[in-house]
Amino acid sequence: MNLAAVVGGSVSSDWKSWYAKGKEKYLFDGDTRHVVYNPVFNYCFFWDGGCFLNLAEFEDELPDLDLDVILYANERHGLDESNWDKYSVARLKNKYPKAKVIGFIKEITVPSHRYKNWIRFLNDSDYVVAPATGRMRKLPVYKTIQSELNKKINFFTSPHDIESIYDKFYSNVKDNAIFAYLPNPMHRRGRTVEFAEYIGKKYDILVIKKPFTNGSNDAMYMSWEDFTNLWSPCLWHFNLDPSNLQQGQHVVAVANVGSINFGGMNESHQVLFPETATCDESILEEKFVEYLESPEKRFEVITYAWNKLNELYGIEVVKKQLLNMLENE
């Protein structure tokens, strides 16, 4: 089965189109390896012959491909009336007539002036898929979206290449250090840095942060691999993101490398590290002391997160969800 993950309208220019070869990504314009990482890319490795398309590169003509399934996320300017024909589901279907198009809900916060065309895009698709593992499936916003669709929302977990991350970054010997993780959006940073520095000073533990450039936490200047090499040796990972509308992809990686996450309200925080999935600093400090003083407790927490990771987030798990949806249409 040939699958393409496609994005239109919002994706960074860093997300170049590529094709899968083995476990690597290669740009269409040559044999240059592409190293940008996002879990949605893992759909392209479900079967041989997968690829990723950034439609901004193909506004004039789509590439000649033999596709069976298209996972399509259309957002932002791709939903504007002036750009509709370039980013419509109909254009994909005309070029790839045998392919089933899956409308992928990459974000659930859509501006009001684009909402109508976003629903139109989802209704034009053959299926609708939203990435959610547990409690996010019950968010009121999904009930609202479902009421406007002509087909049901299918909930998948996000596929993570657990084996590759483990091989590259896992270690059972960790530095007794805290990594203070900051998402790029300011409103999602909460009191992560302040709390990390408080705990670090009180318990004499090194606090590590991503280097800032020009006062910004811009992710563009550091590769994903370099960034992971920076934080993965730390035993403690602090991320007090207060949003309950986010999946929390980063904390999935935290569980994958054998570190322990503290704080935050994203879905993966609750699934993988339920005892510390809060922004209540008194609870977090109490748990930190408990874990700090008990190797047995740390092992229990890391083992629980590892088992949940493999149960819910593996590539084969999500591939099975996709096949079940396609076979039961």
Regions found by a protein language model. Name each.
Residues N2-G8, K25, V35-T144:
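Extended catalytic core of nucleotide-activated donor transferases of GT-like folds
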Residues S17, E24-L27, H160-W224:
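Conserved catalytic-core segment of nucleotide-activated headgroup transferases in glycan assembly
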Residues D31-V35, L292-E327:
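A charged, aromatic-enriched C-terminal amphipathic alpha-helix characteristic of glycosyltransferases
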Residues E107-I108, G134-R135, E148-K168, T213-N214:
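Short beta-strand->alpha-helix junction loop in the catalytic core
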Residues T228, Q249-V257:
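Short alpha-helical segment that forms part of, or immediately flanks, the ligand-binding pocket
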Residues N229-Q246:
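Acidic donor-binding loop of glycosyltransferase active sites
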Residues N256-G264:
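Short hydrophobic beta-strand element within catalytic cores of glycosyltransferases
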Residues E275-F299:
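C-terminal "capping" alpha-helix adjacent to the active site of nucleotide-linked donor transferases
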